[in-house]
């Protein structure tokens, strides 16, 4: 993908007319005047739900993509999907893998260790009853084209493999530790040939992926992500997820080099000068929906500066969302208990 195309994607807000412009203004106003409710708070990981996935399908000669985070290197290898002669190795890419991983993190965090419609914490199993329902929960259109794209990206996501490497030196030795992480241990995908929207899936996450999504993910506002993903570029969204997660524990000014930023966010952008321009444009877009963000981009320096800022989602709103999730689990349990008391165990199980 050319730098010009990527840059246009960054600037593209997805507007096709007056109606979309009005919706966008209304969304910005809504973000400004109220905090997100429990349904609008999801959880993101700066790598696992964002930058690890390429913005577009890499060329056939690319074996893996990788991102570093301190001493850790995350590597993504494409999986094989399809049947018979249609089998092919492809990467999950674009916005849908990001939303799918964030949706999983939301379901896991909201379950709070209890079994729900979508999560069984004991077996670390995720259930998607239908693609239509999944699209609705992710705030996506219900049309057939969207449902087909989500289904395809879900299959690519579940087929890929992640590995995490840590290296170090000491006493004349080089040590490298590697953990191999297929996202799932087992998966069943049900395809409805007549209507893709009724397709679904059940899969068991690996312990490592489940734990990282449940413990290392940071809250974000889905109204913000909806705005940032309106265009074709995922860069504004990735920057937002990284920044709101970083601000949680930031107590002092933090310089971040342009080289580090390019490695993290510059996939498929060949010219660093173009990347800097696009990063600044994406950052300005993020600031529209994250007004408390304080990030400085000195004109003639080789770094940007993160100043301590509030997180995108206030702590109070997160606590309220967690309390609402606990109430929801309690209500499900009470309904099950009431059903047992009224109808007996056998009938309650079938409900």
Could you say what each language-model-derived stretch is?
Residues 1-351:
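Charged, alpha-helix-forming regions
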């Amino acid at each position: 993908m050319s730098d010009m195309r990527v840059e246009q994607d960054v600037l593209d807000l997805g507007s096709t007319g007056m109606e979309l412009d009005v919706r966008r203004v209304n969304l910005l106003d809504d973000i400004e005047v109220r905090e997100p409710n429990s349904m609008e708070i999801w959880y993101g990981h700066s790598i696992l739900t964002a930058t690890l996935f390429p913005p577009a399908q890499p060329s056939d000669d690319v074996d893996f993509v990788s991102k570093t985070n301190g001493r850790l290197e995350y590597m993504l290898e494409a999986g094989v999907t399809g049947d018979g002669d249609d089998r092919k190795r492809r990467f999950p890419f674009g916005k849908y893998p990001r939303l799918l991983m964030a949706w999983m993190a939301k379901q896991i965090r909201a379950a709070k260790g209890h079994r729900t419609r979508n999560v069984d914490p004991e077996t670390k199993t995720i259930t998607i009853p239908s693609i239509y329902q999944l699209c609705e929960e992710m705030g996506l259109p219900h049309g057939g084209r969207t449902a087909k794209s989500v289904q395809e990206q879900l299959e690519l996501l579940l087929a890929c493999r992640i590995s995490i490497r840590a290296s170090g030196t000491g006493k004349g030795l080089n040590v490298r530790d590697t953990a191999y992480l297929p996202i799932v241990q087992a998966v069943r995908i049900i395809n409805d040939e007549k209507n893709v929207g009724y397709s679904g899936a059940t899969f068991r996450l690996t312990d490592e992926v489940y734990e990282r999504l449940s413990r290392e993910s940071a809250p974000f506002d889905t109204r913000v992500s909806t705005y940032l993903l309106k265009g074709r570029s995922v860069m504004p969204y990735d920057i937002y997820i990284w920044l709101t997660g970083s601000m949680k524990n930031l107590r002092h000014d933090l310089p971040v080099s342009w080289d580090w930023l390019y490695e993290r966010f510059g996939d498929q952008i060949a010219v660093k000068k173009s990347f800097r321009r696009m990063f600044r444009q994406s950052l300005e877009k993020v600031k529209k929906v994250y007004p408390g963000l304080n990030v400085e981009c000195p004109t003639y320096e080789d770094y940007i500066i993160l100043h301590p800022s509030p997180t995108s989602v206030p702590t109070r709103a997160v606590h309220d969302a967690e309390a609402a999730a606990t109430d929801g689990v309690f209500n499900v349990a009470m309904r099950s208990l009431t059903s047992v008391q009224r109808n007996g165990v056998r009938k309650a199980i079938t409900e």
